[in-house]
Structure formats: structure tokens, C-alpha cells
Regions:
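In a subset of proteins, long, contiguous C-terminal domains/tails are tracked
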Residues: 166, 499-545
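Short acidic, glycine/serine/threonine-rich loops at helix termini
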Residues: 44, 243, 247, 326-328, ...
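Generic recognition of flexible, low-complexity loop/linker segments
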Residues: 2-5, 16-21, 105-106, 116-121, ...
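Short amphipathic alpha-helices in soluble, non-transmembrane regions
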Residues: 214-216, 327-333, 435-437, 536-537
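Ordered core of a single globular domain
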Residues: 1-70, 283-338
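M16 family metallopeptidases and their MPP-like homologs
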Residues: 1-6, 26-36, 42, 125-156, ...
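His/Glu-based metal-binding/catalytic segments typifying zinc-dependent metallopeptidases
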Residues: 57-155, 304, 311, 315, ...
Length: 545
């Protein structure tokens, strides 16, 4: 069969196959899924009536039997597993954990008035990983979401020398991909130290470095931003993608919104990828047809502001020989960039605890509550990551997921001091917020068995010591460079994790209480349930437009 297909391929076999079986096939169905506002609520009411009717048909003995079954289930949910059963599970011992942090050595080459080069040397099988970090400090607050949209445009539109299809083919032929992104690198929440960056990255076999950088230059310098129809298409696609991401990742949207209540860097990030960015895209879509050129001119002006060699950092993962070649090839790329100084702009969107409820047509909720401990004067300690493990896998798992019926209950605790509870596909709102507050009592009475304590301590290292590729190690090393994180500090953090004791965990309870007492929370979820609890919110709105 394969030989026959090979022979017929040159004679239009696949073209005829597509024409016959797909394009000219009359056996097809078009199915439309149309949302109906209020349908979920009506179904809920119908179910309540059905259950009430069913209950009325039962005898007292049958009702009592159902109550007894429910009580047995609740008891099972709240009863810890037996020690002898847990002991049957295979496990590591704390002695299996490495005490020393493996270094990630970085070569830094900096010269006054020139871009800085960073090199993480590792075996990459002849692949060069490159990334350019452009400083976004010179972008005005109102133009920050324009930067985010530029990352959606560059690489998707045609250029001076290629159509969009030809550009995609050229990139696929010579490289492993070229991408642009905008992000915020955080050093300290308490000190409000963060670094917004626009990045252009790519990877290619080392012999194709010149083609890789030539294509990067083509994308950032020669993209056709005057294609009105393509820009409009991308705007609509971005709006649809954001709405889809909200639908499947509302817990992430809720967490990022919560962080923006107390940290300027997170507020900045809202304009790059969060709800603020979505609102911006909606506004642009609504007014685009009236004056498309005004928005296109704005895209061009912001891109020109970004593309300068001032404060530029070029990173590379690969061999020393390939790094030297990368530096040479980069010089040609730098010649096409501006050399204007980055004039730092003040960020004018103030942080504020808004306690928002975002209404959706979903039947479930995503509930986030928390704050940053460094803003309360409590420095970050390695124990924070242990707390994430024990709170997420023990307390929140049992209370929010098992007892509360949520699909997920998570503890989000970062090395920057963020501490939050987060639920996923949760039938509750107020009950979940109360369970987050219950973390205080859990910590006050923290008393795991020695085996359970050690299991959670070992589990803490599952994220810290996960295997990393050469490119991922390089990314970690580059982030440490930007945030001035030393090897000594990383080692100290690890030592603090290994030094955790139950007494130290219990001593954290007052900090958790102070965090929960800030009463900062976000809910994305069912419109009726949010309205039923409207008194707890400062602001309520529909999530999407």
C-alpha cells in the first residue's frame, strides 16, 4: 500500500483524496452550540424540584438511611488514613536529599554603552538557544497592553521580504521557532523591584545562527504592521483566545488578579496578559473600524520605543565556540536597532484591594485569597515552600476538595512571599473563603506524625529538584542574574527548608492570620452565586464582554 501511495503521490493522489472525501463529500453535518443565558440556573431549579419530589416519596426510614450514608461519607472524608496503611507506600528518606545546591555558572560580558551578553554553557547537541531582553521601562502606562499585542502580531504578519506563509516556512526550515513575549521579572515585592521585559527568542542548529538572527531581524524590523485586515483578524483572535483561556484557566486569572491588588509588578502584568489586557483588546476591537490607522501608528511607535540597544541583554545557551559566533552575528542585528536611551516612565496604575467578583456562565467558581508576607514585615524563608506542600496536599486538599467538593484546592506560596489559597471548579464561595481562614488554626495545631512530616518535607523538593534541560537551566541562571540572586542565597533557602521543624510551622500561624486578615480575595464564577453573596464584594462585573 505504501509503495502504491508513493507512486501515485506525484500524480495528484492526495489532492484527489482530499477533494473526494472532504471537499465534495455531501455526508456532512454542521452543528452549532449556542449559549442560552440562565439555562444553568433553570436546570438547577429543576433538579431541586426533582430531588424534593423524590424526597417526598421516601419513607422516614429511607430518608434516615440516606442521612446515615451521608454521615458515613463525611466521617470517611475527615478521617486520616491509618499509619499502618501509609507505611505500606514506598518512599524516600530525608537522607536521600542532596544538601548542596548545584551551581549554574554564568558568564557575563558587559561593556559601557553596549548590550550585555550572558552565556550559560552546557551540552545542547549543537543547538543554539538565544534570547534578547529589551527593557520596557520606557513604555508609558497606557501603552503597556500595546506591547502585549505586538507579541501576538510579530511573526504572524508578512514582512517586507516574505508573505506570512512564506515567513512561517522560512522559520520552520532554518530554526526550531522564533517567538516574542512580554513579561515582568520580580526581584522584591516589599521593595517594589521588578523589571518589565520584551523578549525575542529563537533556537536553531549552530550552523544556522546567521539565518536565525536574520529572521529575527526580519520579524522585529520589517513586519507589515499596515495590513489592516490582518491586524483586525489578530485582534479578534486574541480576544477569543483570552476568553477561552478564562474559561479553562480561571483559577490562574483569579490568582494573577489577586496579586495585582498589592504588588505593582503584578499590576503591570495585568496589562500584559490579565483581565486589564482583555479589557484593552475589547476596547480596541470596538473602535478599530472607525480609525484603524491610529492604532497601527501606535503599534509602530511603541515598537520603535522598545527596539534600542540601551539596556539590552542578549542571552545564549550552548557551547563556548557557538557563543563566540553568536556574539559576532549579533553585531549585525544590533546595527539595525536604535540607540536611544531608555527614559524610565512612571507606572500610573495604583494597586488597590478591590475584592472583585467576576460573573461567568459557568456553574462553578474559582476562589483566590491571600497577600504577600514581606509587605507585612515578614521576610521569606525556605520554610515557605514546605508550607506550600503541607497546606496544599494536606489541609486544602481535604477541606476544599474532599469536603468542599471542589475539583482542586491549592496552596500558592512563592519565594517572593506571596501566600494564597486557590480553588478550581469549586461549587462554593463563602465556605471556601472560610476554609482559607482555617489555615491559621491548622498551623496552630500542626502535629503531623514523624513519617508524614518527613514525607511532606521530601515532597517540597519535588519542584526544586526537578530535572531541567540545558535551556531550562539557562533560563533559571538568567533570571537569577536579573534578580541579583546569589548562589549563597539559594543555598541558604535550601538549608532553611531542611531545617524546618513542627515548632517553626506552628510559629508561622500569626503570619498566616495577618495575611488572611488583609481580606484580599477574587472570585471568578457563577453569576447567580456571586450575586447571592454580593455583600462580600466591593466590585462585581461580568468577566467577558
Amino acid at each position: 500500500v505504501l509503495d502504491k501511495m508513493q507512486e501515485e503521490m506525484a500524480n495528484g493522489y492526495f489532492e484527489r483524496l482530499i477533494q473526494t472525501t472532504l471537499l465534495d463529500n455531501t455526508h456532512a453535518a454542521v452543528i452549532t452550540l449556542a449559549p442560552e443565558p440562565g439555562l444553568g440556573d433553570r436546570k438547577d431549579e429543576a433538579l431541586k424540584e426533582e430531588l424534593a419530589t423524590y424526597k417526598a416519596s421516601l419513607s422516614d426510614e429511607e430518608v434516615a438511611a440516606l442521612v446515615e450514608q451521608t454521615q458515613q461519607l463525611l466521617e470517611r472524608q475527615t478521617t486520616p488514613d491509618k499509619e499502618e496503611d501509609l507505611a505500606k507506600l514506598p518512599k524516600l528518606s530525608i537522607e536521600d536529599i542532596d544538601r548542596e545546591v548545584k551551581p549554574l555558572p554564568l558568564t557575563v560580558e558587559a561593556s559601557e554603552g553596549k548590550p550585555t551578553f550572558l552565556h550559560y554553557e552546557d551540552f545542547t547537541a549543537g543547538i543554539s538557544y538565544v534570547k534578547y531582553y529589551f527593557d520596557l521601562s520606557g513604555v508609558k502606562t497606557e501603552d503597556i497592553p500595546v506591547v502585549a499585542f505586538l507579541t501576538e502580531v510579530l511573526g504572524e504578519v508578512g514582512t517586507a521580504n516574505f508573505t506570512d506563509e512564506a515567513l512561517s516556512t522560512e522559520i520552520d526550515f532554518y530554526t526550531g521557532g522564533i517567538g516574542t513575549n512580554a513579561t515582568v521579572i520580580t526581584e522584591s515585592v516589599a521593595d517594589n523591584l521588578y523589571y518589565p521585559k520584551f523578549t525575542v527568542s529563537g533556537k536553531a542548529l549552530s550552523e544556522y545562527q546567521p539565518q536565525l538572527l536574520s529572521l529575527i531581524e526580519e520579524v522585529v524590523h520589517r513586519s507589515n504592521l499596515d495590513d489592516v485586515e490582518k491586524i483586525k483578524e489578530l485582534l479578534l483572535n486574541v480576544k477569543a483566545d483570552l476568553e477561552m483561556n478564562f474559561n479553562y484557566g480561571s483559577h490562574v486569572a483569579a490568582l494573577r488578579r489577586l496579586e495585582s491588588y498589592y504588588y505593582e509588578g503584578a499590576k503591570y502584568l495585568q496589562s500584559l496578559e490579565g483581565i486589564d489586557y482583555y479589557d484593552f483588546i475589547c476596547d480596541v476591537v470596538a473602535g478599530f473600524d472607525e480609525d484603524p490607522q491610529a492604532f497601527i501608528d501606535r503599534l509602530k511607535a511603541v515598537l520603535e520605543t522598545i527596539l534600542t540597544t540601551d539596556q539590552l541583554v542578549a542571552t545564549f545557551v550552548g557551547s563556548k565556540e557557538d557563543f563566540d559566533h553568536f556574539k559576532q552575528v549579533s553585531e549585525d542585528f544590533f546595527k539595525h536597532l536604535g540607540n536611544h536611551k531608555v527614559e524610565k516612565q512612571a507606572f500610573t496604575n495604583p494597586v488597590e484591594v478591590l475584592n472583585e467578583g467576576f460573573k461567568t456562565a459557568q456553574e462553578i467558581n474559582y476562589v483566590a485569597k491571600g497577600y504577600n508576607q514581606t509587605l507585612l514585615g515578614v521576610p521569606v524563608n525556605g520554610m515557605n515552600l514546605f508550607l506550600k506542600s503541607v497546606l496544599g496536599l494536606d489541609y486544602l486538599w481535604n477541606t476544599v476538595r474532599v469536603q468542599g467538593g471542589a475539583y482542586g484546592g491549592m496552596s500558592v506560596i512563592t519565594d517572593k512571599g506571596d501566600v494564597a489559597g486557590l480553588s478550581y471548579r469549586d461549587p462554593n464561595i463563602v465556605e471556601t473563603l472560610e476554609r482559607y481562614d482555617g489555615q491559621v488554626e491548622y498551623l496552630e495545631n500542626f502535629n503531623l506524625s514523624e513519617a508524614e512530616f518527613e514525607k511532606n518535607l521530601i515532597g517540597t523538593f519535588s519542584t526544586i529538584d526537578r530535572p531541567l534541560s540545558a535551556a531550562q537551566k539557562g533560563a533559571v541562571a538568567f533570571t537569577r542574574y536579573f534578580t541579583h540572586l546569589t548562589q549563597e542565597k539559594v543555598q541558604q533557602f535550601r538549608d532553611e527548608i531542611l531545617a524546618v521543624t513542627p515548632e517553626k510551622v506552628r510559629a508561622y500561624a500569626p503570619t498566616m492570620k495577618a495575611i488572611m486578615d488583609q481580606n484580599a480575595f477574587v472570585v471568578i464564577g457563577n453569576d447567580t452565586k456571586i450575586e447571592n453573596h454580593k455583600d462580600i464584594f466591593k466590585n462585581i462585573r461580568n468577566l467577558t464582554k
